[in-house]
Amino acid sequence: MGKILTYVGIALAVAAVLAGIIFSSNRTSSAVNKPPEAAILYNIDDYKKVDPALIGYTEVRQIKPAFRELYGMACDADDKIYVTGDEQLAIFDPAGDEISRIDLGHEAKCVTLSPDQLIYLGLNHTVAVLDRNGKALRSWVAESESAVITSVAAGERDVFVADAMNKVVLQYDPAGNLLRRIGEKDPESERPGFIIPSFYFDLAIDPDGFLWVVNPGLHTFENYTFEGKLRASWRKTAFDLEGFGGCCNPTHMAILPDGSFVTSEKGLVRVKIHDPTGQFRTVVAAPNQFAEGTVGLDLAVDSRGQILVLDPKTGMIRIFAKRSS
């Protein structure tokens, strides 16, 4: 671990500063509105072996943050790495040396950067905003104190918050004013809303400025405008590499500059890439590269196209680069 250049100690107070691919446009296929078929007995061991020819990435290095527990991760435009663990936020330079550590006072299960490089944190039911130096700027409590924030995505004028407890995406302006609720169950259109059997519920903004939300219980990716309108979706329920299986996968995603999706799963633990329409492209990390019981693989992508995998089981940031052809 490199020398810590700065240490910023900031306590955020609780009250104050804290099968096939389906793709549609401007509508969602009726297949997306139906939960996967009833569960049957299966053996995921049959799917753990991956043809090496399908693995397009190799692990090039690891970073070991000094945390007991790891929660969330993000990269900024300069490839600095932001990791939350315990009740702190640690920042690493691209070489993997820790350059800052910020006391939060609460566990932050997710972290992201806005286009103007502000730091957004999800602290249980509170969104906290810091500047690049770790100074607390503002915070707000999500619409309900029962909220469990699992993901935050920030645009220039919009902040999207995934609330896994209430099964809704909350859209705010940067000051924390609620603009709308997105993706709720709608009996009139027969949309089932977000199916979230466990607290894994991720979202991200793509390079074209649209919001993507994982509907994990349906193994579906849903694409929304910033006005909250569903404009497209794709889904593939399957245990093979083409799709996603189990109760609720993928658990995490990141979006590459070309709009492709990097995904991680639990149960059948693996990291893959699907193209913008959902077609399987390649494996980043196969099941045999993870310890038994691994869950919570948060993902990030740096400017070089490297894929960062936060592995809570090993306590590592694992960095994967594309294999040379």
Spans of features found by a protein language model:
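Eukaryotic scaffold repeat domains enriched in small/polar residues
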Residues: 2-325
